[in-house]
Amino acid sequence: MGDKNDDDKNIEIWKIKKLIKSLEAARGNGTSMISLIMPPRDQVSRVTKMLGDEYGTASNIKSRVNRQSVLGAITSAQQRLKLYNRVPPNGLVLYTGTIVNEDGKEKKVTIDFEPFRPINASLYLCDNKFHTEALNELLESDDKFGFIVMDGNGTLFGTLSGNTREVLHKFSVDLPKKHGRGGQSALRFARLRMEKRHNYVRKTAELATQYYINPATSQPNVSGLILAGSADFKTELSQSDMFDPRLAAKILNVVDVSYGGENGFNQAIELSAEILANVKFIQEKRLIGKYFEEISQDTGKYVFGVEDTLNALESGAIETLIVWENLDINRYVMKNSATGETVIKHLNKEQEANTENFKVADSDLALDVEEKLSLLEWLANEYRRFGCALEFVTNKSQEGSQFCRGFGGIGGILRYQLDMTAFDSEDGEALDDDSE
């Protein structure tokens, strides 16, 4: 899987997390909220028939208000299903019903989408809340890890994804042992031995590239690599010039195992369990660590804070955009009705409570809000336009927590140095409003 696909997957996961949050918070009156999940290869006709039967049953509900809202929800589910001739390859998720919003007003909602990977659940429930349990399995990691188990008798290449392990290839090798005989030939024996070892390490390095680099994208097809084995072959491999640098960057751990082959593979999996469970955590620490390194070395290739980061983004200078996954800032597009000028502001909860932020500077004229969207959502939709990678981080690691508290939860690693003061003079007014 290329890095771009990883990016896309992380953003899909963030979107699902956000959706689950909003669905779980929604409540309705009576049992008028439908949760419908169809796995891949299910039949639309089966579900359409089932909804028809449900409609008949719901017509007998005694309470008129509840009956009408349940029938309304079933009808909107039927209408939405008409848009699909067949179930999409990854299945179909549909939520529809009448929810009660914060003001106590009723609002109809319908959400339907194809998950970003196959969903192995079949569900139909009519309740006073949406059921999202099945969506949680989409968040579970399907990362694939590569294992190279190397000792004096041979090498095994394998992968582990979830609980599925697979042996890709293994080969054995016959290396000469160290011995004290030979007299004058001792040097020659030692040289032959070193040569054979060198060839063995080279063969392993070449096969590693063959099995763990995707030729189509020229990127590793695994999220991380574990090198295992007895003796020091594994260390020799990891430090060798012959080992592909793209794979060297993916090494998560080097472990000592007492066996070679499949037994060694199993042992390596056990010894690496904790690291594999925390791989997202490790990637996050590395990413923010790299960001902090730019700051501590004062390279000028970093940016933080909402306005500076977005200015750098607009200028195409950001290589990696780093955002806290719970950043609570909204993006407002507002219009000055007197001049027709459009103003964009990014406000946190505190700033939203200040009415001055919704007025034209130095006047009492109110700005018309044309669009309000969470900044996170706007970035998830738009980041590709700016040619950067988007990384969502948590505040669970020490580095993540420091990034959220000390740097406002948004920043970026730049492609080149950028003078941020140039933006201040151009756009001083907006910056005064939005500075945190």
Swiss-Prot record:
Heterodimer of two subunits, one of which binds GTP. SMART domains: eRF1_1. Pfam families: eRF1_1, eRF1_2, eRF1_3. It is found in: Cytoplasm. Directs the termination of nascent peptide synthesis (translation) in response to the termination codons UAA, UAG and UGA. Modulates plant growth and development. Belongs to the eukaryotic release factor 1 family. One of its GO terms (cellular component) is plastid. The gene is ERF1-1. GO terms for molecular function: translation release factor activity. One of its GO terms (biological process) is translational termination. Signal peptide: none annotated. This is Eukaryotic peptide chain release factor subunit 1-1. InterPro entries: eFR1_2_sf, eRF1_1_Pelota, eRF1_1_sf, eRF1_2, eRF1_3, Peptide_chain-rel_eRF1/aRF1, Ribosomal_eL30-like_sf. Keywords: Cytoplasm, Growth regulation, Protein biosynthesis.
